[in-house]
């Protein structure tokens, strides 16, 4: 399996019993509605556990949670996913999240930064390259109008700047 090949599965749940307004239809409505609410609560709990493990760089815990079916894009109470809060210098962790389907282009709800902005700002070239190969966009500006290359330049990460300029030029 390639580094960015996504694993099948995740937390796909049957939402056929719910109409577009989210109300329940069908004979098993009470039971299914209760299960749906329970699922949302479980996913929220899983999102907290996954993001906490990712932020701490706990690769084994992240892997175990994903293998148990935790949605790789589940968010914590701040609305951030594991790939947004992960320990950026841990390339193995980034690869695992991406393999399980983490979305590299989800903007931070407050700053609009993508994980590539964070990797560029901190100078993590290997993580940045992996995110880019997984489809991360390099042309998205954060809420201050900065591109990942701007952040790398501000911090003096010359190798990151060179990489970003080269891939943008070759695109």
From Swiss-Prot:
Locations listed in the record: Cytoplasm; Nucleus
Q: Gene3D superfamilies from the entry?
A: Ankyrin repeat-containing domain
Molecular function per GO:
cyclin-dependent protein serine/threonine kinase inhibitor activity
Q: Which PROSITE patterns match?
A: ANK_REP_REGION (PS50297), ANK_REPEAT (PS50088)
Q: Which GO terms describe its cellular component?
A: cytoplasm; nucleus
**Family label:** Belongs to the CDKN2 cyclin-dependent kinase inhibitor family.
Q: Which PANTHER family match?
A: ANK_REP_REGION DOMAIN-CONTAINING PROTEIN, CYCLIN-DEPENDENT KINASE 4 INHIBITOR B
Give the protein's recorded name.
Answer: Cyclin-dependent kinase inhibitor 2A
Which organism is this entry from? Monodelphis domestica (Gray short-tailed opossum)
Classification lineage: Eukaryota, Metazoa, Chordata, Craniata, Vertebrata
Please state the gene responsible for encoding this protein: CDKN2A
């Amino acid at each position: 399996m390639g580094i960015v090949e996504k694993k099948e599965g995740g937390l796909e749940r049957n939402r056929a019993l719910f109409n577009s307004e989210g109300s329940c239809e069908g004979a098993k409505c009470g039971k299914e509605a209760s299960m749906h609410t329970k699922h949302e609560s479980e996913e929220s709990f899983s999102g907290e556990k996954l993001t906490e493990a990712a932020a701490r760089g706990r690769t084994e815990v992240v892997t175990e949670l994903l293998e148990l079916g935790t949605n790789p894009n589940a968010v914590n109470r701040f609305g951030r996913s594991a790939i947004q809060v992960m320990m950026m210098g841990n390339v193995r962790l980034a690869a695992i999240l991406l393999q399980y389907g983490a979305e590299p282009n989800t903007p931070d709800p407050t700053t609009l930064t993508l994980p590539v902005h964070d990797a560029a700002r901190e100078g993590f070239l290997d993580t940045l390259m992996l995110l880019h190969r997984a489809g991360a966009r390099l042309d998205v500006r954060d809420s201050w109008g900065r591109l990942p290359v701007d952040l790398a330049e501000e911090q003096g990460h010359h190798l990151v700047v060179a990489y970003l300029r080269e891939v943008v030029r070759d695109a």
